UniProtKB/Swiss-Prot annotation:
Residue windows of the LRR repeats: 28-49, 51-72, 74-95, 97-118, 122-144, 145-167, 168-189
Tissues where this protein is expressed: Exclusively expressed in spermatocytes and roud spermatids within seminiferous tubules during spermatogenesis.
PANTHER family: LEUCINE-RICH REPEAT-CONTAINING PROTEIN 18-LIKE, PTHR48051
SUPFAM superfamilies for this protein: L domain-like
Induction description: Up-regulated during sexual maturation and dowm-regulated by experimental cryptorchidism and heat stress.
The species this protein was found in: Mus musculus (Mouse)
The protein's name: Leucine-rich repeat-containing protein 18
GO cellular component: cytoplasm
Location within or outside the cell: Cytoplasm
Record carries keyword Protein biosynthesis: no
InterPro entries: Leu-rich_rpt (IPR001611), Leu-rich_rpt_typical-subtyp (IPR003591), LRR_dom_sf (IPR032675), LRR_domain-containing (IPR050216), LRR_R13L4/SHOC2-like (IPR055414)
Amino acid sequence: MAKGGKGPKGKKITLNVAKNCIKITFDGRKRLDLSKMGITTFPKCILRLSDIDELDLSRNMIRKIPDSIAKFQNLRWLDLHSNYIDKLPESIGQMTSLLFLNVSNNRLTTNGLPVELNQLKNIRTVNLGLNHLDSVPTTLGALKELHEVGLHDNLLTTIPASIAKLPKLKKLNIKRNPFPNADESEMFVDSIKRLENLYLVEEKDMCSSCLQRCQQARDKLNKIKSMAPSAPRKALFSNLVSPNSTAKDAQEEWRLRSPSTF
């Protein structure tokens, strides 16, 4: 760390640079993609582009999100994953057009999540995974339009009943939390009969240790299969034609899906 306790100086984003990073999505949305650019401070110049529909600031080194982010009143999709953010501003509750919020892989604690999140009445996907949450924010129980919630890889010991009562919840990831009862997460998921508890990820998006564990599990499964009788069996997932075509496309669709597809 530099003298005086200051962190590394990140890349400076000018208005012209930001304008050149605007892309039009397949469904006609304006997306500002500033991911993986070494940004350490929220670039205030982008507030002049408040008509964008989607904002991607993921995989940078941003520590603080300013209250002024609420100027993005048309924003439907906000991706802040993989930064150093330890709290969200109260003003985020004013961004009532949000459908998708990803703040996974940051430094968020439960106290760093403002109660104003309960004002996001239209939001459908919230990813809070890979943070330091020791309890589930009660605000989530007020978000009746939620379809997908990520709470994996935190410090959770219990899940409130209000989550199970979310009427439109379809996907919930609560894996790798220190639940006192090892079966608690499975029991909770099973209690929501409508839940689709399936998560896909591409190899390029996994850390080396996770990838190694998955490969070991796959090798073990292949060994078991090779020892089993070779009688013809009906495929469990007939739509997964090949691992390098249909399945890969499905994985990419899940990872990059726009809120407009919900």
